[in-house]
């Protein structure tokens, strides 16, 4: 059999050699059986020259076409039209993407299958997508739909495809004989043009069959730079509006009969990824205005009108688990699953407690928990809320229960319905497996020594861990302690002289101490610590999160990923924002304590009044930072200097108004941006009167300063503790809360902040010039905080 490949090409010069070699070197004879039509969709790189080089070698097999840029669908359509106009006699066509590549047996497997299935009723062949992670050079057979290929070759009637859905045109073969005049929808961007095309084709040929071949392997490249088609699709309005309207809804409306299960499942699969993303990253929808958000929600509900509840319940996809099935049924269908499940999420071997969670949508439900037929002792509980758009998607009840050694049976009833129990993805009838794991963890914990390991950043100290270490060193001299810090740190010699036991954050000895430590106490949550010995590094250790500052925004998305045993907070509002019900955090009164920050003891003690120093301390932007390197530091981002952040702060720092404050009023100006920004200091090209190098403690800066200017940084709380004024310069508020690593929380800068908020630097300077001689008059401080003996309080909680 002969085959045609149509490939849409756009700026893929660095991938074309892999693409061509994988096709030319096929086990099935390339020259006799495989023809390639490459449609250059207006590439601006060297793609055309590379294609023409291969075309010279194989003029009968390779066709090159050029068109102005119009998108993948228009390029593929040009290829299909070229086939028709030139009367191609190849019965099968596929749409291999030119940044991907094929297994050597790819065409051979398809050809062998067709040779043994000549009954002419196969209209589509689906092939096995293997993900190739370019950065790690890793092949992973973990595509969400790979269950289709876990057994031998599968042949299914199109009317009964059900879960065997096909969304990729690149990894399937279409029989030209049945294609008629069907083309890709050129209006559909950034995705679903493949899925719509294939499934319109299957609906047109509902009485034919499709085959799925496990050994025909298609290697999908996950690009190192994150520029694969699927990586950026959620950054466009079309993903939320056009795809739902012209993609999903059009597919449903064009179906001439009842929408078959496979077509429902295609849309359910694609729409699920949208829902999943928006529950965990609601800020992604900020690209839509209010009218567009309303339209998006309306389109979601219209699409779900075509999707049967039965398909939602039965959909076979690992990621589409109980949580999403229950939530989607509740949200879109106002229905519930017939069964309910409680999940045992975590085991605390130290306190003989287990964390049980279950999902619900009725706040007024009644719960009864029995351990061996006796009412269980609930140690801590929490209601976590999941939202989708402007409505609750689902609630999660989190309960810590105390176990006894001989506890055998756990029964949980919600509104008299008994919940099934799941542990490690398996249903369980009793607690035997739980107790085995509990005892195994206890044995592992016995291997810990009485060592406390402290860390701020691997390359910087001068934060809460340093201050708490110093307190323990002086007040609990018998306690075994060590401090993790690179020898290259500017703090290394200072702490060494003071008697700190310093440990290099790499090598065998570092890992050995992580293995032996009973408590790891850090102001940051860095991968080099929590992943030092693999994913279970902290399982049988206490991780004490001292924090880098006071949480004022919603950090739940980041912090919920981590195991934290003691979570330090400093203000009543911060504490309540984390442990309270109906928020996004997983943490409860079990982990979260109100003590104040360790560094505050020294801060208050060393405060200096009547100084003339302005401290400028903007925070960082995750989206402007380079890639994370080893030990938490980040590489330079060459695009940083083009950013609004850089331009606005450079304009501010180089302004005549700032210089006037220094010269006319005799103020020192100190610019100390976030540590992740300091690598760009030279780019700001600042005047000599601005101090940027500071080798002392960061605390001294707060104590010696009379005013702070920041944007969103929680260091403003340090000035509030000292009852000193703060001004906020926020020129990018909308962008910041959409693109940074957290979303807006309980803290309103205008109501709760410690000074005026300005979007324009000229307004800030105008205000400051009026108030410069009476700075104490502009102090705003309504905070309820914990500031007495903070180190002592923290150690008491740790012990």
Per-segment meaning from a language model:
Residues 12-26:
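Short, well-formed alpha-helical segments that are part of the catalytic scaffolds
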Residues 155-243:
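Conserved nucleotide-sugar donor-binding catalytic segment
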Residues 40-49, 71:
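A conserved acidic beta->alpha catalytic loop
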Residues 101, 105-144:
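Conserved donor NDP-sugar-binding/catalytic core segment of glycosyltransferases
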Residues 258, 462-476, 598-683, 758:
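Conserved catalytic-core segment of nucleotide-activated headgroup transferases in glycan assembly
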Residues 67-88:
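Glycine-rich, basic loop-to-helix element that forms the pyrophosphate-binding segment
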Residues 442-445, 449-603, 623:
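Active-site and donor-binding regions of nucleotide-sugar-utilizing enzymes
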Residues 588-589, 682-687, 712-783:
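Catalytic binding pocket for nucleotide-activated donors in carbohydrate/polymer assembly enzymes
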């Amino acid at each position: 059999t002969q085959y045609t490949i149509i490939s849409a090409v756009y700026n893929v010069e660095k991938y074309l050699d892999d693409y061509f070699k994988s096709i030319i070197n096929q086990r099935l004879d390339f020259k006799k059986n495989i023809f390639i039509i490459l449609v250059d969709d207006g590439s601006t790189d060297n793609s055309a020259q590379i294609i023409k080089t291969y075309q010279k070698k194989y003029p009968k097999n390779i066709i090159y076409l050029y068109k102005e840029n119009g998108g993948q669908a228009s390029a593929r359509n040009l290829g299909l039209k070229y086939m028709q106009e030139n009367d191609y006699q190849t019965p099968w066509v596929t749409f291999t993407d030119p940044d991907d590549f094929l297994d050597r047996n790819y065409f051979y497997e398809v050809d062998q299958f067709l040779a043994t299935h000549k009954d002419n009723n196969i209209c589509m062949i689906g092939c096995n997508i293997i993900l190739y992670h370019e950065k790690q050079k890793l092949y992973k057979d973990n595509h969400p739909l790979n269950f289709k290929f876990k057994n031998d070759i599968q042949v299914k009637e199109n009317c009964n495809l059900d879960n065997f859905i096909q969304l990729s045109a690149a990894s399937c073969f279409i029989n030209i004989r049945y294609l008629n005049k069907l083309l890709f929808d050129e209006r559909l961007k950034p995705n679903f043009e493949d899925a719509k095309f294939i499934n319109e084709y299957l609906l047109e040929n509902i009485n034919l069959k499709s085959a799925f071949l496990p050994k025909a392997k298609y290697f999908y490249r996950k690009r190192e730079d994150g520029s694969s088609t699927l990586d950026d699709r959620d950054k466009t309005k079309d993903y939320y509006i056009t795809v739902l309207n012209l993609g999903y809804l059009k597919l449903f409306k064009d179906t001439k009969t009842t929408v078959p299960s496979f077509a429902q499942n295609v849309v359910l699969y694609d729409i699920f990824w949208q829902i999943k993303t928006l529950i965990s990253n609601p800020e992604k929808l900020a690209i839509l205005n209010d009218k567009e958000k309303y339209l998006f929600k309306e389109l979601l509900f219209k699409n779900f009108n075509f999707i049967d509840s039965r398909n939602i319940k039965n959909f076979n996809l690992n990621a589409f688990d109980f949580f999403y099935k229950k939530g989607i049924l509740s949200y879109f269908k106002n229905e519930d699953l017939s069964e309910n499940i409680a999940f045992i999420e975590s085991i605390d071997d130290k306190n003989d407690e287990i964390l049980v969670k279950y999902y619900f949508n009725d706040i007024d439900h009644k719960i009864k928990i029995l351990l061996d037929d006796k009412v269980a002792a609930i140690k801590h509980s929490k209601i976590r809320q999941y939202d989708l758009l402007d409505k609750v998607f689902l609630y999660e009840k989190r309960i810590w229960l105390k176990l006894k050694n001989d506890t055998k049976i756990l029964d949980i009833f919600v509104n008299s319905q008994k919940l099934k129990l799941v542990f490690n993805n398996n249903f369980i009838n009793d607690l035997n497996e739980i107790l085995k794991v509990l005892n195994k963890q206890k044995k592992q914990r016995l291997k810990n020594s009485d060592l406390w390991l402290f860390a701020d950043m691997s390359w910087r100290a001068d934060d809460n861990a340093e201050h708490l270490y110093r307190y323990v060193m002086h007040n609990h001299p018998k306690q075994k302690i060590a401090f993790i810090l690179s020898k290259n740190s500017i703090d290394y010699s200072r702490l060494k002289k003071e008697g700190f036991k310093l440990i290099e954050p790499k090598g065998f000895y570092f890992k050995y101490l992580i293995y032996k430590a009973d408590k790891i106490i850090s102001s940051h949550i860095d991968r080099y610590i929590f992943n030092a010995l693999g994913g279970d590094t902290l399982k049988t250790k206490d991780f004490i999160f001292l924090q880098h500052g006071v949480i004022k925004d919603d950090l739940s998305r980041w912090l919920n990923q981590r195991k934290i045993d003691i979570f330090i907070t400093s203000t009543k509002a911060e504490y309540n924002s984390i442990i309270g019900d109906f928020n996004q955090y997983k943490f409860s009164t079990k982990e979260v304590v109100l003590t104040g920050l360790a560094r505050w003891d020294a801060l208050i003690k060393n405060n200096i009044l009547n100084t003339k120093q302005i401290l400028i301390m903007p925070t960082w932007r995750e989206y402007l930072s380079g890639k994370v390197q080893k030990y938490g530091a980040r590489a330079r981002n060459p695009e940083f200097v083009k950013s609004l952040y850089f331009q606005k702060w450079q304009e501010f720092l180089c302004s005549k108004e700032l210089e006037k404050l220094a010269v006319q009023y005799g103020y020192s100006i100190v610019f100390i941006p976030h540590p992740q920004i300091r690598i760009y200091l030279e780019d700001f090209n600042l005047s000599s009167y601005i101090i940027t190098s500071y080798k002392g403690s960061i605390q001294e800066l707060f104590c010696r300063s009379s005013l702070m200017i920041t944007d969103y940084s929680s260091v403003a709380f340090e000035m509030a503790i000292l009852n000193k004024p703060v001004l906020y310069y926020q020129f990018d508020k909308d962008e910041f809360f959409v693109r940074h690593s957290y979303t807006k929380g309980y803290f309103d800068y205008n109501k709760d902040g410690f000074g005026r908020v300005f979007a324009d630097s000229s307004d800030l300077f105008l205000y400051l010039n009026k108030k410069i001689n009476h700075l104490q008059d502009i102090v705003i401080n309504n905070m309820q905080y914990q500031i007495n003996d903070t180190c002592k309080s923290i150690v008491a909680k740790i012990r």
